[in-house]
Amino acid sequence: MTNIRKTHPLIKIINYSFIDLPTPSNISTWWNFGSLLGLCLTIQILTGLFLAMHYTSDTMTAFSSVTHICRDVNYGWLIRYMHANGASMFFICLFIHVGRGSYYGSYSYFETWNIGVILLFMVMATAFMGYVLPWGQMSFWGATVITNLLSAIPYIGTTLVEWIWGGFSVDKATLTRFFAFHFILPFIITALVTVHLLFLHETGSNNPSGLISDSDKIPFHPYYTIKDILGAFLLIMVLMTLVLFSPDLLGDPDNYTPANPLSTPPHIKPEWYFLFAYAILRSIPNKLGGVLALVFSILILMLFPLLHLAKQRSMMFRPLSQCMFWILVADLLTLTWIGGQPVEYPFTIIGQLASIMYFTIILLVLPTVNLIENKLLKW
């Protein structure tokens, strides 16, 4: 009798995606973060669903409904902080996942890479709208400042902002629609993740050497299922340590003050995972220029396949490119730090230099280094 997992219409899809999938034998721990992102998405959808059962998206009651969840709902505090810190874990995994793709040249799978960039945009949009929901001071002012950036778009800007707000300021209509979008987007993300995997399985996984690995493939199960389970345990351990010992470590104290349109917080800043983009936005004195730089700082990822001029795919055997890659990582960490600092000397100038460096390394330095390496290797 033929094995059911290979014949059943539904089970065979799972089989050829997670069980009998031929996988390169040498993929490292950096390849664990795809499955960890799946775990993060699952945690976020489940905790979010339970939070939505008790949350009310009304300006009068939103803040108190979150307080009610933390105080009166059974393990509400746990669900709320798992959701808030789960977002941080999600972004840590996302940044590592994108970094790994950049380092090992995974962007040469165009469709997989471009869908990944779209997914990154969607997760960022979802996280931004979720941050508005508790209706604290930073929620309100963050929403006001970021949505207001669209007014920089010539001609239609102001109309567009008022259309998104549903009025002349961030108010009840804005909160209600943000809740609706925050609820639906993760399911759209899940659908896109399926497409992301579909395209990945068309080509098979990349590996650290960047070489074709068809001659040396092993089944995904049990080798990589056990490896992914270990990664999942470690992620849950880090998340629960954060949730149970210092749940507010990555949050903003201002968000424990109910939203007040009449009082602006001294320093408006987003969550830590947006700070690098926020620093780039603030580095440009012109409003429209800042918005374009902000969007392009993420959109630039789509240019990676075009900017790859090296004859080798991976950076594994290219020490000069490795050096530039880690300088870029250090630059992004600098931007993250600057994004959380007030707009004053010396932070402004450091931010401007780091922003120029970010775009220069990606658009100019890395492609040039690629050509130098080709020359050195006599290719």
Curated annotation (Swiss-Prot):
For the keyword Nucleotide-binding, the answer is no
Describe how the cofactor binds: Binds 2 heme b groups non-covalently.
Offer an example of a GO molecular function term for this protein. Answer: metal ion binding
Q: Which InterPro entries match?
A: Cyt_b/b6_C, Cyt_b/b6_C_sf, Cyt_b/b6_N, Cytb/b6-like_sf, Cytochrome_b, Cytochrome_b_C_euk/bac, Cytochrome_b_N_euk/bac, Di-haem_cyt_TM
Which positions are annotated as binding a ubiquinone?
201
- Ligand binding (heme b b566): 97, 196
Please give the chief subcellular localization of this protein. mitochondrion
One Gene Ontology cellular component: respiratory chain complex III
Binding site residues for heme b b562: 83, 182
Which cofactor(s) are needed, names only? heme b
Membrane topology per the entry is: Multi-pass membrane protein
Report the Gene3D superfamilies cross-referenced here: Cytochrome Bc1 Complex, Chain C (1.20.810.10)
Membrane-spanning residues: 33-53, 77-98, 113-133, 178-198, 226-246, 288-308, 320-340, 347-367
Query: What Pfam families does the record tag this protein with?
Result: Cytochrom_B_C, Cytochrome_B
| GO biological process terms on file | mitochondrial electron transport, ubiquinol to cytochrome c
Any idea which UniProt keywords this protein has?
Answer: Electron transport, Heme, Iron, Membrane, Metal-binding, Mitochondrion, Mitochondrion inner membrane, Respiratory chain, Transmembrane, Transmembrane helix, Transport, Ubiquinone
Instruction: Name its cellular compartments.
Output: Mitochondrion inner membrane
What more does the record tell us?
Heme 1 (or BL or b562) is low-potential and absorbs at about 562 nm, and heme 2 (or BH or b566) is high-potential and absorbs at about 566 nm.
Q: How does it assemble?
A: The cytochrome bc1 complex contains 11 subunits: 3 respiratory subunits (MT-CYB, CYC1 and UQCRFS1), 2 core proteins (UQCRC1 and UQCRC2) and 6 low-molecular weight proteins (UQCRH/QCR6, UQCRB/QCR7, UQCRQ/QCR8, UQCR10/QCR9, UQCR11/QCR10 and a cleavage product of UQCRFS1). This cytochrome bc1 complex then forms a dimer.
- What is this protein's function per UniProt? Component of the ubiquinol-cytochrome c reductase complex (complex III or cytochrome b-c1 complex) that is part of the mitochondrial respiratory chain. The b-c1 complex mediates electron transfer from ubiquinol to cytochrome c. Contributes to the generation of a proton gradient across the mitochondrial membrane that is then used for ATP synthesis.
As for family, the record states:
Belongs to the cytochrome b family.
- Name of this protein: Cytochrome b
Species in which this protein is naturally found: Callospermophilus madrensis
Q: Which gene encodes it?
A: MT-CYB
